[in-house]
Amino acid sequence: MARITVEDCLAEVGNRFLIVQMAIKRVKQYREGYSPLVESKNKEIVTALREIAATKVLPESYHTADGKKPGSE
């Protein structure tokens, strides 16, 4: 079983407090009926951290180095 930690997510987000907020929000979305974006047989919080580490979920204020949001032209 692969382990996921907040440190795994820090490389993508950079702020541990934001990671926790993102994970909590994602767990609430699961409970509202949203489907997970990664395959996981773990608890909801671990699945949320896996999504963050895989950059399937990004913070709303996320911008690239050029100041644009990913995917915006």
Swiss-Prot record:
The keyword Ion transport does not apply. It catalyses: RNA(n) + a ribonucleoside 5'-triphosphate = RNA(n+1) + diphosphate. Belongs to the RNA polymerase subunit omega family. The RNAP catalytic core consists of 2 alpha, 1 beta, 1 beta' and 1 omega subunit. When a sigma factor is associated with the core the holoenzyme is formed, which can initiate transcription. InterPro entries: DNA-dir_RNA_pol_omega, Pol_omega/Rpo6/RPB6, RPB6/omega-like_sf. This is DNA-directed RNA polymerase subunit omega. GO terms for molecular function: DNA binding; DNA-directed RNA polymerase activity. It is an enzyme of class 2 (transferase). The keyword Transferase applies. GO terms for cellular component: DNA-directed RNA polymerase complex.
